Structures are given as C-alpha cells and as structure tokens.
C-alpha cells in the first residue's frame, strides 16, 4: 500500500479526534473545531450507528497507523515484531513505534510535525551518535544521542524550533539546548505516547 497523499485533516475527521498530523497548525486551524469538521469525510458524513467491536478495533489501529505515518504493511510488520518480544504485545508495539528515529526527532521538538521530522531524517540532516542516519524507521536504544550536523545548527528554522521548544519532552528523553542534542534515557512506557492509544484494541484487532 502506498503512503497516503490526501488531506490529513480528513484523517482526523475520520477518527473524530485530533491526530496533530500538521503539528502546531492543528491547534489553531483545526477542522474539528468547526461544526462540519466533527462529521466524517464525505457529503453527508458517516451514518450514526453503534460501532461494532471490530469497528472499534479497526479505528484504533487506523488511528495509530496514521499517527506514525505508516502503511498497512509497515504497521503490520511492527505488530508481528512486537508479538515475538517478551511482555505485552501492545506495550511492545507502542515502544517500537515511539523509538523510531523520525518520531524521536519530533518528540524532542526538532520538527514541528512528524512529516517534517521524516523529511529531516530522509535528507540526511540527523546524526545518531555522530553518524548520519537517513532512515526514518531506524530504531533507537537507550544512550543514543540525536543531534544535527554542525553546519545545520545555525540554520534559522532550527534556531526558531529550539526557541519555541516547550517543556513537553517526555520523561524517557532528555535535551541539551546548549549542544542541541537529545538523548534516549530510558525506554518509553505505554502511557508516554504523543497521543493516547489503546494498544489492547489493536491487539484484539490482530487476534481476530
């Protein structure tokens, strides 16, 4: 399945909640803040019927997949990997998704959206332990240090992002503004995703 190229606002309307796919722009100009935006996409929106258990499981899986910008195949592969790990498959899945390099760049505040974070990584503008990594799915581990090459640290856009950075960096990450470097200090817990996800519903979806 190819990557979705349509309006990301439609995806939020489909899930009936903000997924913050456009970063900070979602807060100020979100379709969900308007009456029409609260309906599902389409001329008349979705009919108001009680969702089946399967539909609830599907919607939660789709919400998570869209939040991390993954194709169906990519998301399914993450779940298969999570199942093989020790512990809860749901918790393992969220851990794998959160430790993606593009997601960590976003969570550190080095990009205004996950899409921007993916582009920054794809263009080779991120170093992990002083080595250039241009693979968004690269899985980070405890102790990894994420930063920009020296020539990019003076970039106007990067400086503005650092200036606007708020104290919302999750506890499993740390950031040194003087060095413009972030560090993975621990593994993320299930409740530390950028947006609430009920991983148990996803497990039940794949268990069918």
From Swiss-Prot:
GO terms for biological process: ribosomal small subunit biogenesis; translation. The keyword Repeat does not apply. Gene3D superfamilies: Ribosomal Protein S4 Delta 41, Chain A, domain 1, RNA-binding S4 domain. Keywords: Ribonucleoprotein, Ribosomal protein, RNA-binding, rRNA-binding. Residues 32-53 are annotated as: Disordered. GO terms for cellular component: small ribosomal subunit. The keyword RNA-binding applies. Pfam families: Ribosomal_S4, S4. Residues 99-161 form the S4 RNA-binding domain. GO terms for molecular function: rRNA binding; structural constituent of ribosome. One of the primary rRNA binding proteins, it binds directly to 16S rRNA where it nucleates assembly of the body of the 30S subunit. Part of the 30S ribosomal subunit. Contacts protein S5. The interaction surface between S4 and S5 is involved in control of translational fidelity. Belongs to the universal ribosomal protein uS4 family. This is Small ribosomal subunit protein uS4. It comes from Endomicrobium trichonymphae.
């Amino acid at each position: 399945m190819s990557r979705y190229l349509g309006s990301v606002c439609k995806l939020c309307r489909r899930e009936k909640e903000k997924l913050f796919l456009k970063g900070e722009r979602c807060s100020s100009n979100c379709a969900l803040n308007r009456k029409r935006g609260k309906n599902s996409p389409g001329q008349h929106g979705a009919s108001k019927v009680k969702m089946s258990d399967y539909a609830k499981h599907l919607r939660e899986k789709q919400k998570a997949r869209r939040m991390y910008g993954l194709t169906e195949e990519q998301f399914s592969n993450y779940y298969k990997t999570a199942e093989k790990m020790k512990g809860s498959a749901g918790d393992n899945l969220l851990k794998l998704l959160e430790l993606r390099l593009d997601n960590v760049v976003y969570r550190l505040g080095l990009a205004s959206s996950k899409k921007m974070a993916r582009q920054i990584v794809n263009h080779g503008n991120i170093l992990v332990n002083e080595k250039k990594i241009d693979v968004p799915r690269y899985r980070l581990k405890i102790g990894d240090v994420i930063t920009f090459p020296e020539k990019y640290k003076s970039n106007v856009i990067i400086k503005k992002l650092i200036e606007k950075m708020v104290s919302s960096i999750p506890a499993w990450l740390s950031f040194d503004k003087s060095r413009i470097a972030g560090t993975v200090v621990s593994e993320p817990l299930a409740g530390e995703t950028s947006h609430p996800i009920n991983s148990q519903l996803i497990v039940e979806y794949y268990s069918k």
